[in-house]
C-alpha cells in the first residue's frame, strides 16, 4: 500500500489567492509569461518561471533563475501574501474547464513508492496511455 499523508501546505491567503494563482509554467513560453504577468506582481509565475524577471538573454536553466525564484517566493511569504497551515491536512481541489469537472486530492507520497512503481506515474494513469 502506498504511503499517502497529510501535510502543512504553503498557500496564498484567501484574499490574495486570485492574484497569486497562475497557469502552470509549462503551458507557455517565457515571452507569453512576461505578457501574462503585466500588472500582476503577485502572480506565481514570478516564482515558477522566474526568468521573466531577468534579462531576456538569461538561459532559463541558469543558476540566477533559481536564485530569483527563491527571492520571489521569499518576498511573497515575507510580505504576508502566503500562509502555512498549522496542522497537516489533505487538500481537495476541483478544476472546471469547458464544462468538464475534475476533482483531486493532494497529500504527501513516498519517493520510494514512486521510484518502485507502487504509485503510477502521471503519464500512465489511464489504460489507453499504458
For every predicted segment, state its role.
Residues 1-129:
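A cross-family signal for N-terminal binding/gating loops and helix N-caps
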